[in-house]
Structure formats: C-alpha cells, structure tokens
C-alpha cells in the first residue's frame, strides 16, 4: 500500500484537489499488478497480486505517476511541499533519503529546505539537508515508527515563478528511499502532466 494525499487546504484557506494517475508500478524492474482506491483525502495504491506471497527479502518498488498542482508560486519564492514516505505504513522505516532536481541552474544559496518527521501533523526535526546547484538532498537522522512520515518543503528563491514556466521544458524528480521500502516516486515530465 502507498497513500498519496490529493486534497489539502492552501494558505488562503481554499480547498485544493490535485490530479493523480498511476502510470506504472514495478518490482525489481518488472511490471507489478496494482489498483487504486479513493480515500477521503487522496488515493491508495494497492501493489502486488493478493494471491502471491513474497519470500522474506529486500525488494525495490518503483511507482511512476502523473500529478499536477504541486508547485506553489509566491511573490518571493516557488515551493514544493512533499510527503516523501506517506503515513500509512504499519511497519518502521529505517531511513529515508530524498533528492529533488530543479529545472535550470539554481545556485545552492537560492534553495532552502525545511522538513518534518513523525506522525501526521507533527513537526519533528529529525532530518538533515544540503543543497548544491539545482539539487537538494534530504535525509532522516533517525528511523521512522509505524504511521510516521517524512515531509519536506523545498523553496527556490531564484526567479520566483520560474519553476512553473520552466517545468514544461525540464524534469523535476523526487526520489525517495527508505529502509525496508526502497523506491522512486517521480514528478513526471511536465508535458505528461
């Protein structure tokens, strides 16, 4: 299972619903059966064949999806707020690392990262981040317990509004990996959005 929130309230108090379509799910590079279920505030992806039990071990899952309305554009910055892991896990996650590649040539001092760890709504500070040209990397500094998540807020203070105008020509990717769950969640090419 992987839950993706698609409904939220923005800073102006308006209800926002984002698009979300699963394009492909893979396990260890091979297509994996999946289905989606609507939730009150999002979409749940059920992954795998319910009649097939996997042997204990490490598996890599890749979820490719299309989403929209994820970038916020403000007077002094653009931002991406992302729930990297989701909160729906019934087991602990040993560690989480996520990386975002920004369009264009954004200098490291034009990127600000803030993050939160813990149960939904918590503002835990168990994380570290670094930025380099057009790239920001975030990682947790402790494992996450069941139903805990890692969220991050990435701000680009260079050419506000540029993220929206650059997206159709460039790729922005969010990669998440964590403990027993390792995968790639991606914001696809904007011409797919």
In which residue ranges do the predicted regions lie?
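Lumenal/extracellular ectodomains and adaptor appendage modules
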Residues: 1-193
